[in-house]
Regions:
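Large intracellular
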Residues: 3-5, 18-152, 225-280
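Helix-termination/interfacial motifs at the ends of transmembrane alpha-helices
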Residues: 7-10, 14-30, 140-222
């Protein structure tokens, strides 16, 4: 369970509701929840939510849009990617290979749940050329990362579209306010009409910053974690195939992990590592 995402979204909406409720009748107390009615407008909902949804549909393939529930499920039920655990498994394989040879890895590989890890081990068990193995695995990582990037970009585009349609709604409201203004009746309704016009901008900003941006950020973070683990697998498998010492392999991978943590080892387009295909 991704508690930080849930706490952030729920906490953000709660604070917004409290903020919108402050400043009512003093006799009621510090919070006047009847003021929430001031922030409700059906036309604004249609413009912002409808316009944003139309942008998502028009700009993305149907297969990707249909996986929206899956994307949300990934975020809420976030699987942890543990690079240290990956290193431990690689060292275990290195010890088996050093003691019994590469062919002895097949039995242990069949017990792996990660298809990418299993594929990587089986490629060296089958005696494939090391350069071809690296190229194949790196290509898999790049393709996975590209698909993940497309998914995250969909939500980033939605976060840009929501405030834009909020502004469209505001302009529509202002136009209607000016057209319907009664020259003889004065400007007594301008404040109310202006408030309604600004509600669409409010909806757009909330939708962008409390819904779409957090989703996109979580998906990108998850992609980075997956890609890091996959790259560790590639480096480890290559070291096993070349017959390197298990202790040296551990130090090498831990050094790679430390370099990545300091920002020096992130090479997304060259093939960052990960485990799984959740965002596809």
């Amino acid at each position: 369970m991704n508690l930080t995402f849930i706490l952030g979204i729920v906490g953000g909406f709660i604070l917004l509701v409290l903020g919108m409720s402050i400043g009512g009748e003093p006799t009621i107390g510090p919070f006047d929840f009847t003021q929430l009615a001031n922030f409700g407008d059906a036309a604004s909902i249609f413009i912002v939510f409808g316009g944003t949804l139309a942008t998502i549909i028009a700009g993305n393939p149907g297969k990707m849009i249909a996986k929206f529930p899956r994307h949300i499920g990934i975020i809420f039920n976030q699987k942890k990617f543990n690079p240290s655990s990956v290193i431990d498994e690689i060292v275990e394989f290195a010890q088996i290979a050093r003691k019994n040879g590469l062919l002895a890895l097949e039995e242990r590989a069949n017990q792996l749940e990660d298809p990418f890890f299993k594929k990587s081990i089986m490629l060296i068990v089958d005696g494939n050329d090391s350069d071809k193995v690296r190229d194949m695995l790196t290509s898999d990582i790049e393709q996975l990362s590209t698909r993940h990037d497309d998914v995250a970009s969909m939500y980033e585009k939605a976060s840009a579209a929501a405030p834009a349609f909020g502004m469209v709604g505001t302009l529509i409201g202002l136009i209607n306010m000016l057209v319907n203004m009664d020259p003889e009746g004065g400007s007594s309704n301008i404040g109310k009409d202006m408030g309604v016009a600004l509600i669409t901008t409010f909806y757009g900003v909330i939708l962008a910053n409390l819904v779409f941006n957090p989703i996109a950020n979580n998906l990108r973070t998850r992609d980075e974690e997956e890609c890091l683990c996959r790259q560790l697998i590639v480096e480890g498998v290559m070291a096993i195939q070349s017959g390197e010492n298990p202790k040296f392999i551990r130090e090498k991978l831990e050094g790679y992990l430390e370099q990545n943590a300091t920002g020096g080892g992130s090479e997304k387009k060259k093939g960052r590592g990960g485990r799984g295909k959740e965002q596809e």
